[in-house]
Amino acid sequence: KRRANKKDFFGINVRELKEDEIEVFKDLMNKTSIRKGFIDRPLGYYKQMYSALSKDKILRYMVAEIDVDKCRKNAEAEISKISKRVEKLMEHEASNAGRIKEERVTINSNQKIIEQLDILEKEKGKIVPLSVVCLLTYGKEAIMLLAGNDEDYLQHFNTSNIIVAELIKLCKNEGYDYYNFYGITGNFDPKSESYGLYTYKKQYGGEVVELIGQFEYQINSLVKRLYDIMLKAYKLTKK
């Protein structure tokens, strides 16, 4: 909740992408697929999905984008405000040592944010998309089908949390009863590679629901073996 509440401070705007902006979604999905080691869909697939399902709001591509100027202005204002507090606390430095230390940590944190904003603006401009979600809605349920992030800046601006919090509020206001975070591996071992995905989805207060599952019927075992080999080779090249 604390992270999600940083939306206004960071100048984050969550909105629906238009048809001519689908490449924004594709770009962040591609970056995420390389980082996570899965095969991303081609741009044409996402465009076909949009064409078939967006008219009735069944499918929406959502983006969280940062306003660099707004965020910098807020961080600078925060530094100025805290610096004045520290100046006042320094009048009785010995008794306020703990608070002074905490305030200086916050100042340093905001200075790092400004440093990241300078890099971000130089590389990508003033309005920068950092997180995307493919949202599907049907009946009484909203499904977070796909999600992608710019990992280089995720640590500083928390857009993966902000976009989810905003979409949960959106879906609640639209009358949906459930927000489905979609799949997890079912491996709840804290040492497993997939545990982070589970904790990320669980932190919003959701419940784990086990569905019927799926099975594979191999029509051609040779083709299936070739596919598995090629998939493994593809993932190795991505690493």
Set out the residue ranges of the language-model regions:
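Glycine-rich loops and low-complexity Gly/Arg-rich segments
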Residues: 38-41, 87-90, 157-161, 168-171, ...
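Acyl-donor binding region in acyl/amide transferases
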Residues: 128-130, 137-204
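C-terminal catalytic domain of photolyase/cryptochrome flavoproteins
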Residues: 159, 183-239
